[in-house]
Amino acid sequence: EATARMNTARRTLHGKLISQMDLRRVDVRNMSEESLRQSTQSLIAEILNNDSSIAPDIDKARLAKDLLNEVVGLGPLEDLLADPSISEIMVNRFDEIYVERKGRLTKVDIAFSTDHAVLGAIERIVAPIGRRIDESSPMVDARLKDGSRVNAVIPPLALKGCNITIRKFSKNKLIDQDMINYGSATKDMMRFLEIAVEQAANIVIS
């Protein structure tokens, strides 16, 4: 329930923040990343101080951080990207996000405020590499600064809403015991592959 209230507050304030930026004619394209962050941070603080509709039990510091990440960063994906235990992130729509940990897929209790916010995150991913995504080109592949692979799909190709899949690169190399622990392979399977490699046999993976 607390998460639902936080998400509702974030959606409401996200709309107000975007409206204020539009009214003030903030041209984000001509601003440095640091200038945009500082300007947005000040505007968020102003909105939070003047908005009496925010429930008293809402963590305003967390709300401000979430709003800032959503406008100038990758929204709720920022914390997921910083989590070393997560190997893959899948956004099926703005409020449906899954992560993979140790080979197991689970739904996380976080969300973007709107589908438009997901699109904004995608645009911030592809803009630095000179790519674009729109209705005429609704799918794009890219990489984050850390090398993580990104695939993004938007309507009309995506039916439920904007999709993002991020495959992170683990700092620790995967070994055969990891595959066994994750349930991806058995000891016999790994031993068979080891023998096949030792014998320089042809291996077909399909």
Residue spans for each PLM region:
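Hydrophobic anchor at the beta1->P-loop junction of P-loop NTPases
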Residues: 205
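P-loop NTP-binding catalytic core
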Residues: 83, 91, 96-201
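N-terminal anchoring/assembly modules that precede and organize ATP-driven motor systems
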Residues: 1-106
